[in-house]
Amino acid sequence: MMPFSCENGATLYFPKTIFKKIKKSQSFENYWKINLTNKNSLKWYKILKKLKKDFHFEIICDLSKKDILKLTNLRDIKQMLKREASQLIIWKDNKKNFNEFSKMIKINCKGSLNQGGRFIQISSPCNKRIATKEICHIYHESFRDKYYQSIIALGDNKNDRDMLNFAKHACVIKNKYSTPIKLNSLKKNVFYSQKEAPWGWQESLMKLNKKLNGKINL
């Protein structure tokens, strides 16, 4: 079991089998949970319901199971809908109104918008780079230099860019639904996959592991 984050870094989970009680964490099943945001999914749902009066968009959790399955191609949507700190929307209005909507979320609601491949996540400010840094910090606090820290990041959307720039090794995964991610021009150790996820993840890690002489425990 390894630590992980969800909802674009809004919430972190650390397995109790590896980590002792972590500051500011809550007990959640077999994990210590840390929330990096200050509004939960229910609060965001209520905010978005009010904003629907002025803008044209759909809140994903309001759609039928059939429509969500068609949009996502997922076999099981339970985990996708089990959100703690955010809501997903599909924008159906024009660009001008989207700019106005974005201002209201950011300024009036103190929130952020993370554009994924097909959906937009609405939450309190968070991103995967912040989550990655926090996980690294907690590793260091818990184990000091026991574990070798060389961060590898894989991503295929704009909301992965900050995390990819932060990592020592960045794997940009091909994505037909999104424009190519542009990383910092001085960024080193960047690998671009030829395949899309999930095979692009495997392709990237296999080639990176070869470059690192088998240091990745696959």
Segments predicted by a language model, with ranges:
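Mg2+-dependent phosphoryl-transfer enzymes with acidic/Ser/Thr/Gly-rich catalytic loops
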Residues: 106, 119-218
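Short, surface-exposed amphipathic charged segments that create phosphate/polyanion-binding patches used
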Residues: 18-23, 72-75, 207-211
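Active-site phosphate-binding/coordination module
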Residues: 1-61, 175
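Structural signal for conserved beta-strand scaffold positions within catalytic alpha/beta enzyme cores
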Residues: 5-6, 14, 59, 70, ...
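Short, well-ordered alpha-helix to beta-strand connector turns
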Residues: 1, 85, 167-168
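Conserved acidic, metal-coordinating active-site core of Asp-based
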Residues: 51-152, 158
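Generic alpha-helical structural signal
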Residues: 42-45, 49, 99, 133, ...
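Short, basic, helix/turn surface patches
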Residues: 8-18, 84-89, 105-108, 142-145, ...
